[in-house]
Amino acid sequence: MRNFSFVLLPLVLSLSFLQGGSSGSKPTGVNMPLFELRDLKDVEFAWNLTDWKGNKVDSLSMDIYYPTGATSNKKYPVVVFCHAGGFTGGNKSNVSSLCDELADYGFITVAFDYRTGYIKNNPHACTTDTATLFNAVYRAMQDGNACLRFIQANGKKYNIDADWIFYGGSSAGASIALNSAYCNDSIAKIYFSREYKLLGSVEKSGNTLPRNYAIKGIAAMWGSLFSDKVIDKKFRAYPTILFKGDEDSGLPDSVGYFFGCPNYAPPLYAGAGIYAALVKQKAPVVYYELPGANHPAYDDDFCMQNIACFFKNVMSGTPYGGRYTYYTPTCPQFDGEF
């Protein structure tokens, strides 16, 4: 839904009870107003930040999309979806259509702004300033973490079922979802030691809310992860659905360097590399690889249909997995319509 407001429906739920009910029955004539939940725009979740040039960022905000017909007497699972932009640009409005589509499948969806910017130069020629690039990735992880903490702390206010938080994104957004899901401060001190010392905690930036959320699943449309060693079921190995083209010029098929440039170390894990690590840990994982496709790969409708199906099966306790090519239908409930 795209009408950003929160309105009272011109309807009232009237509870009428038959005579002869139990002694604990509520009296007849009790009226309980129902609110229709409408999309909310520019909900602030982080404050007092600094961008890559040292300029002050007063706040970051999110947009919240509700399923059509969602009402205030119910809670709904949430998908937090990160926009693309190569860590140099983009904003939450770029994924409004994707959020609308996921909302149509019964999820509250959240799109949020995160800090972007680094000295890009020409990544294809291996001349990107990697220090500023890794800073940009780390800031985005901080901002994603702040968004998730805010959602966990304020779920009731927004009718979010905070027991069912899913995380996803496309391109840079997929990398944010993967990396921030698998990175807490203990991990950051090992894999992002320079950025941690320079930019601070990955889980305390932007707001003072505690990190109490639990991610129940990840959707990554052509994204990467900083290491496969962090996928460990003793700690975290999230149910995941992956999409990627097998001729992606920026990401490796399994493990390798950004744009194939060794000076962009450390190596990244993508596609088959993430899939293999999750299979090894016996975590539910679906991997779609499109032959001949670069970046991006699959169309949005196919991705949203299968993401929604995968997450719903995780919720029902019937997750599925497998590796597929082309547009192979795999959703157990999908037969033309979901």
Regions found by a protein language model. Name each.
Residues 24-74:
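N-terminal cap/lid segment of alpha/beta-hydrolase-fold proteins
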Residues 87-94, 113-138, 183, 298-299:
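Cap/lid segment of the alpha/beta-hydrolase catalytic domain
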Residues 130-156, 179:
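Alpha/beta-hydrolase active-site loop
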Residues 158-169:
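Alpha/beta-hydrolase fold nucleophile elbow
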Residues 195-281:
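The feature captures the conserved acid-bearing segment of alpha/beta-hydrolase catalytic domains
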